[in-house]
């Protein structure tokens, strides 16, 4: 790992950038991809799934290296790198955001990648915090309870209100007392 920027653009298991896997420079043209990953003269136009005619893939193909697990892994990395870097959209995302961008592209699409990196950018987080503080959104409950409609009554007034509501207290002894008067009890039936 020579630089942090290279570390951000890793996708292969061997911790090499996809350009290094294909032995290409970052600004390589599509013709360079064809040269690096070209077909043999025997099959000028093989089907899409056909990988045996490609120079780089032939070196590490599992059929050419039987029993070599490392060659099979390198072959898989070469095919994955070619699939990503030959697609212009995936290549652009890989150049901008690295392997995380490719992972997000595979799961959420191109729009998902854009929104993810916008929402995780430092300037967006700063903007959200600034707007929240300026509009008192995060202090909504505090503002409503302190000075808004849900403001509790002051201590002095609340004591008087409770004293006015209590007219008499029930007896404290264990004696049972009928709180209804006799006049009301006869009228109720």
UniProtKB/Swiss-Prot annotation:
SUPFAM superfamilies per record: Chaperone J-domain
Residue span, J domain: 17-98
Ranges for region Disordered: 154-189
GO CC field: cytoplasm; membrane
Main location: membrane
Compartment annotation: Membrane
Keywords: Chaperone, Lipoprotein, Membrane, Palmitate
Species this chain originates from: Homo sapiens (Human)
Record note on modification: Palmitoylated.
Tissue expression remark: Testis specific.
PROSITE patterns, per the entry: DNAJ_1 (PS00636), DNAJ_2 (PS50076)
Bilayer topology term: Lipid-anchor
Name of the protein in question: DnaJ homolog subfamily C member 5G
Domain of life: Eukaryota
Feature: compositional bias, Polar residues: 161-171
